[in-house]
Amino acid sequence: MKRTLALIFCIFLAGCASKPSVKNLNLKSSLNYGGEELAKILEQDDAVAFSSNFREGVFIYISNAKVANYLGVVRAERHAKFSVKELGKNDFLIKSVNDLTQSFDASLERARELKCGTLVIRLKDKFQDLEAANKFLEQNESAFLKMSGEIRCK
């Protein structure tokens, strides 16, 4: 009986720990630097997608524990704002949506370096809009789950 109660309690704690602790980053709808608009930002509960004039493509900032856990990132840094330096500091270049897992596997050493830090995925293929970028996260959930066993914080 005690073992059963202990097991139920552990499952309860695991469920609480897996819930995202930050619902919103409260980001503005655009990022300005030096008087120039660099990015348009779409905020979601589990990620922030933004298109950028600074670099080509759509960036997806993994801001919440839910998506970070898909990638095996136990602790993801949460920022209230971006800087130009941060846009290119910790990113993975994915050649295409179809080659997501192969490209990521090729960058596994780089992924291990960033496993406990800020994580940005930079996609070469442009989305039609920011909504499509967020759909990308949902459609590739299985690929993220596959990666979660390979990238862990120590």
Residue ranges and their predicted role:
Residues 20-31:
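Short, low-complexity, disordered segments immediately C-terminal to signal peptides
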Residues 26, 41-149:
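Conserved polar/disulfide-associated segments of primarily extracytoplasmic proteins
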Residues 153-154:
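Short, solvent-exposed mixed-charge patches
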Residues 2-7:
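Sec-dependent signal peptide recognition
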Residues 14-15:
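C-terminal motif of bacterial Sec signal peptides marking the signal peptidase cleavage site
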Residues 10-11:
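Short, linear, compositionally biased motifs with a strong N-terminal bias
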